[in-house]
Amino acid sequence: MIEENNTQSRKNDYYIVEDEKGEKFLLPYYAETFRVLMDDKDTIRDVLNSVLGLDRDHEIIDLDYEFEKPIDVFMPEDDPVRLDVWVSTRDKRYFNIEMQNWSHSFFYDRIWLYNAYQTLRGKYEYNRSPYFKSLGKEERKYRFYELPETVSIWFCNFRILNSEKIFKDTWAVYSEDEVSRSSGKEPARPLVTKNRYIIVDLPNFVQLRKSIGSREDFWLKLLSQGPLNVPESEDPVFAGARNRLRVSRMNPDLFKALEDKMFDEKHVREAIEAEAYLKGEAAGKAAGEANERSRNEAANAARDKKIAEYLRSIGVSAEGVSTALAIK
């Protein structure tokens, strides 16, 4: 029993921290603990409004959300990937919020893939919304190709931005010509503002922001460093978020179910393992080919030596020997 408890304690160390009073908290940057943190409309709304920097005229008022939204279009082996948090708002905006701990060779492809699905899904839901259905026939024809606003937000617990001077960047579609002609005074503008990616580099945030000066700072510090590194607050949204991460408030059965899926990033893990295997296989093949070349070169050198010795023994000049060896 002692050995079992020690094993459990070591396992818990990965995603549980304990304060000086002995209170245990979940670290919110794992797959399941992130959902525990985000399982609240007010939290999602506040995270989105602060990270996107939305003013009162554009802030999100009401929303619905769904965890592990499946990408229900064809994927290899019919094995769907899932969006961490899918959010739709009352004013017909669609967001995907991802918490990621691992990079891999096709991480950028993954970002584009998720956004492509998000765009299609957003259009699908937009066309079936009460708003769109309430439009007149000609208005619906006019808006046949209209896309709603779709934003992908990626919280990356690894370095992803090229610059170490920023922790957040917006990616969008730009014209190469406009980018080439842009300057500091007249920067290039995205061709499409409805569809964009917000990339948050949490390691950069930790280096750049040592204290909390905004609501965005609170959320990013909580996500990157955990609940022990943010102050207790009387703000109901902040207090509620921190409280949801208390281990003591969780039902034991729910906690066990959560624990079983804590590291369930199947596709990411498999991609990283497969990449390592393929690189090892390629390195082994290259080493084998190098050894084969080395053996062939040694055999050729030994053969040339014997030919040269024979030619010299029958009186062929040094120039003639060189000419003969060159003819192969």
Predicted regions span which residues?
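Accessory alpha/beta interaction modules
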Residues: 1-196, 206, 267, 275, ...
